[in-house]
């Protein structure tokens, strides 16, 4: 019997299908290794807020500007104290302590300065001693101040979950130290 002397060029269909199958199995294993969705995790949301707050405090010191945070039941927003643009200058009353400065949404480079929580989570801001924060102040003023010297208004932020056992808190004391429910074993 005579064999063909022609050389094989390329891959057979079977070899190609085997490579595609192996690539699909490998991709499936990688996807299964991803962590589960963390949006509804109060500890994750609190860690996210803490990271943003620490970044804001550091940025405030480095760039020497004043920042603030407004806490809403379903979100938080960072603000920067700025003079309005020249095009929107308004006459300044003589008794205005801020001399025309206004709180504007902070827009750091490549970092989010706000977050909205899923419906299962809610925020509650307390004073550092646990008393409720009086929200009767001007609606334009932030609840938490971050000063260029590194000082942060003392507070306790609760991230409440529908399941109370899954709720967490973050506290900043008058020395600027961060304490969380995770580091304290959820003691109140």
From Swiss-Prot:
The keyword Protein transport applies. One of its GO terms (cellular component) is plasma membrane. Signal peptide: none annotated. Keywords: Cell inner membrane, Cell membrane, Membrane, Methylation, Protein transport, Transmembrane, Transmembrane helix, Transport. The chain crosses the membrane at residues 13-35. The keyword tRNA processing does not apply. GO terms for biological process: protein secretion by the type II secretion system. Coiled coil: none annotated. InterPro entries: N_methyl_site, Pilin-like, T2SS_protein-GspH, TypeII_GspH. Cleaved by prepilin peptidase. Residues 1-10 form a propeptide. Gene3D superfamilies: minor pseudopilin epsh domain. Pfam families: N_methyl. It is found in: Cell inner membrane. The modification N-methylphenylalanine is found at residue 11. It is a single-pass membrane protein. Its main location: membrane. Belongs to the GSP H family. Type II secretion is composed of four main components: the outer membrane complex, the inner membrane complex, the cytoplasmic secretion ATPase and the periplasm-spanning pseudopilus. Interacts with core component OutG. Component of the type II secretion system required for the energy-dependent secretion of extracellular factors such as proteases and toxins from the periplasm. Part of the pseudopilus tip complex that is critical for the recognition and binding of secretion substrates. This is Type II secretion system protein H.
